[in-house]
């Protein structure tokens, strides 16, 4: 993926960083990988709103940018695992800060806290 050149621009470090984690899913993927190495299916289950195609695309972009490491095992069936790279790991405080900010401003952001989502009964289930 070709990256923009942000050198010699005011705010370039912020713009370049946001460009790396832009979009709806990259930050969420990085958040989930903070808990350790995961396979594609595990990530997909943690993010029910993402399509298989989009998850594949986002994982490739994060790998191309050096934020995650993809490890393929020579097994049948094939096994592929993803984990944070050292540079991806260095984003941990950034992702944690975004999470904390989101938790403080949930009502304003119109999103339910995780506990409410987990505890909410399914529609039509007694």
Residue ranges of predicted features:
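C-terminal regulatory/oligomerization modules of transcriptional regulators
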Residues: 1-9, 64, 69, 83-126
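N-terminal helix-turn-helix DNA-binding core of bacterial DNA-binding proteins
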Residues: 2, 8-54, 74-75, 81, ...
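Residues within the DNA-recognition helix of helix-turn-helix
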Residues: 58
């Amino acid at each position: 993926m070709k990256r923009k050149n942000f050198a010699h621009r005011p705010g370039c470090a912020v713009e370049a960083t946001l460009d790396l984690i832009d979009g709806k899913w990259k930050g969420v993927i990085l958040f989930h990988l903070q808990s350790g190495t995961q396979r594609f299916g595990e990530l997909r289950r943690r993010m029910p709103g993402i399509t298989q195609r989009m998850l594949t695309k986002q994982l490739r972009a994060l790998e191309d940018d050096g934020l995650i490491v993809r490890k393929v095992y020579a097994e049948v069936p094939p096994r592929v695992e993803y984990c944070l790279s050292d540079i991806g790991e260095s984003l941990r405080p950034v992702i944690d800060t975004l999470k904390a900010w989101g938790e403080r401003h949930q009502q304003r952001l119109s999103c339910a806290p995780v506990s409410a989502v987990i505890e909410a009964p399914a529609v039509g289930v007694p």
